[in-house]
Amino acid sequence: MNGNFAAVGSEPTDAQFEHGIQVIDEDKQYNGLVNDYLRRTHVAEAGFNYHLISVFGSQSTGKSTLLNNLFGTEFSVMSESERRQTTKGIWMSKNKREGKMAENILVMDVEGTDGRERGEDQDFERKSALFALATSEVLIVNIWEHQVGLYQGANMGLLKTVFEVNLQLFLKDKQSSPRSLLFFVIRDHIGNTPLSNLRNTLVQDLTKIWSSISKPPALENAKIEDYFDFAFAALPHKILQPEKFVTEVENLGTRFVAGHRSTQDQEFVGGVFLPEYHRRIPADGFSIYAEGIWDQIVNNKDLDLPTQQELLAQFRCDEISRDVLNAFDEAITPLEDKQAEASRLGKPFVLPDLGDTARSARSKAVEAFKVQASRYHKGVYTRKQAELEGKMDSRLKALYQGQLAAAHKAGVAAFSDAVTGAVKAGQKSGGSYEFAEIVDKQKRKTLDIFAKEAQGLEIEGLAWTNFKPQFLLFEKELDEVSARLRKDEMRRLATRVERWVKSRLGDSIGLEFNKLGSGRGGSGAPETGEKPATEKDLWDRIWTVFVAVVKEAQERFAERAKSFEASSEEVEIGLWRLRRKSWVALRERIDEEVMEGNILLKLRENFEDKFRYDEAGVPRIWRPTDDIEGIYTRARESTLTLIPLLSRFRLAETYASPDLPGWIGNQPPGVEPDDEEDLTPIGGIDEEEGKSLEEEMTVLSESKRQDLVVRFKKTADGVYVEAKRGALGGMTQVPLYFWIALFAFGWNEIWMVIRNPFLFILLLLSAGGTYVAYNLSLLGPMMQMTNAAANQASEIGKQKLREFLENNETARQALAMPASSKSSGGEQVRMDTLDSKGKKKDYDDDGI
């Protein structure tokens, strides 16, 4: 047995203490000389400055080899040729490599589990593992890579029992929760599976077994993280990769130093020895403390092994459960895949006949398990059946929730589309439709479809398949959608009414402004004295027309809103918005009327009616004797008085602006930001916009008024000059003696023309044509065409004569012309080469 180690029951020598001491032997006896060993290794006087590490794992997995290479100890290792147990009981030795590690590290080598020497007697391995867990700061779990994910191979079954008893014996009555570190060292790691994946698998397994253990009453909700931290490391194969193994072991050794937690992510900073792991037992009292722990473990009856009957029942029930779950998977997995695909695409998909399929698959699985497993241990059977039903129900619950979510989403979309379609159909038909009736009908239809789907998913005896809360939630959302659709329809109604208001105002306001152009006396407008109603009361009439139009629009809106079952608050908000938008429409129409071109035209018409027509409305024919200047001055000044009148929206009766804030009213309660975002600010009402009521009522600014006066005066001056020229032009006449002389000297010619019918008719036609051409301003173009035709004819004649002389030998000799080298064709005279006077243009001028 371990050479140079002090065994239980013998008085050790210094040489035997050299490599450690056997704390507990294979017969479960505690060694009372542990304190002597601590004194001889100078650990007893270290106080709290020491650390205890234990190793845990299956037999012959290299636990002792790991400790020897890591801490420089000399625990006995297995002979490869014999493959038998080497470590018996629990041995302890002090770390020999303190250069890169913390001081006073005590290492306990625990007998391996699942050894053939003890066979089915697992009592000692459980108790030794529990002792190591209860006393050590760090418990190294030594496993091979291929054991990760196994239940027995990874010692998960043993850890489950150890966790449960440790919780009951040592933690249930303590106010604080002592923590330990489970340090998993994964041996023979080849790297195909990343360490992070192995870590996730182990953490999931540990969490699962922790959730399944029996906990004391005060610790039902305790989590494994409340008592344990986890660390992980991987080592290569010692035989196949010896150099890499040594390097990784050295790197692993650097982690066994003091450390602390990060304040941000609670990860280790420094080493693995955290202060909360220490049991706070002085080193000189550790031996007594450990002996008490071992005594409590040995004498505890809760550590007895379960009966073989229970083990058999557990094995068979697990096996049967896997078989029935396979059949359950065949029915449910395709449905889960379809639902997942629809969720990935973002499209709601209601699985057909999900309720019947799920009920059938679940009932078949439960019945098959009952038939095969009910003959085994009743307690185990009942527990395993509950586990089986829990697994199936958890999957069905997720599937059902996805189904109802899809039905919910599809139902809401269908409801919205149906209501919108019915409203559009009513609008296209031109008839009236009741929005509230449409909503109520479609809502009942949609709720019936959802209720039918939810009832189809119900499974008898399972309370969680009662989906009344989901139904109420669906109904609530339909109400919200109904409210939103009603609000949208109210907005559309308001838009239609606003368009009607704009149309009415456009005609009515335009008519009132057109009256400004009717200033002639025949219309009843005197040139002096009080202004007629068509001018002085302009704004009164506009305000009266505006109020009447908006009142009618409000009645239309309120009457139509009743069919929507809109609340009085919603109607009041709609009327308030309508009044605001109507005023903005009026201002826009007024601004359009007083645009520079429009208002100047109306002022000119007003002036001309007063200037060109007399008191009876008869057009004036100006004579040099008329008082043109006086009439012009009175008409101009009368028209100029309209500009101040138009510059401000002011009632003649009160000589003040209308009470716009009172007419629009205060903002009703319940107005949301969406109701205000499309509203134009109004001066005197929206004070935060910085525009006063006086500015709101100003139609023409001072600069525009002055500019309008200047432009109008120029226009009026032009009319005056035209009238003056017309009066003076009538004074230019042909003398009478000229006509007498013309008639006397031309009598013979006149009589000749009259007596000759041909000349007389030609004279009439020429005179008539000349008169028409003169009135149509065609005399100039006709003269140009005649001149062009004459010039063209002259050019063509010259060209033809030249060709004749060139081609005729006799004529050429008579004129002594030289023979021509040009072809007979010559240069052609074309109409498109003539200028406006009929002259031939040079080709260079045409750019050819």
Swiss-Prot record:
The gene is SEY1. Residues 47-277 form the GB1/RHD3-type G domain. Residues 1-733, 779-848 are cytoplasmic. GTP binds at residues 57-64. Residues 755-757 are lumenal. Cooperates with the reticulon proteins and tubule-shaping DP1 family proteins to generate and maintain the structure of the tubular endoplasmic reticulum network. Has GTPase activity, which is required for its function in ER organization. It is a multi-pass membrane protein. Residues 815-848 are annotated as: Disordered. Residues 829-848 have a biased composition (Basic and acidic residues). It comes from Pyricularia oryzae (strain 70-15 / ATCC MYA-4617 / FGSC 8958) (Rice blast fungus). Gene3D superfamilies: P-loop containing nucleotide triphosphate hydrolases. It is an enzyme of class 3 (hydrolase). Keywords: Endoplasmic reticulum, GTP-binding, Hydrolase, Membrane, Nucleotide-binding, Transmembrane, Transmembrane helix. Its EC number is 3.6.5.-. The chain crosses the membrane at residues 734-754, 758-778. SUPFAM superfamilies: P-loop containing nucleoside triphosphate hydrolases. It holds the Pfam family RHD3_GTPase. One of its GO terms (biological process) is endoplasmic reticulum membrane fusion. Belongs to the TRAFAC class dynamin-like GTPase superfamily. GB1/RHD3 GTPase family. RHD3 subfamily. It is found in: Endoplasmic reticulum membrane. InterPro entries: G_GB1_RHD3_dom (IPR030386), P-loop_NTPase (IPR027417), RHD3/Sey1 (IPR008803), Sey1/RHD3-like_3HB (IPR046758). One of its GO terms (molecular function) is GTP binding. This is Protein SEY1. One of its GO terms (cellular component) is endoplasmic reticulum membrane.
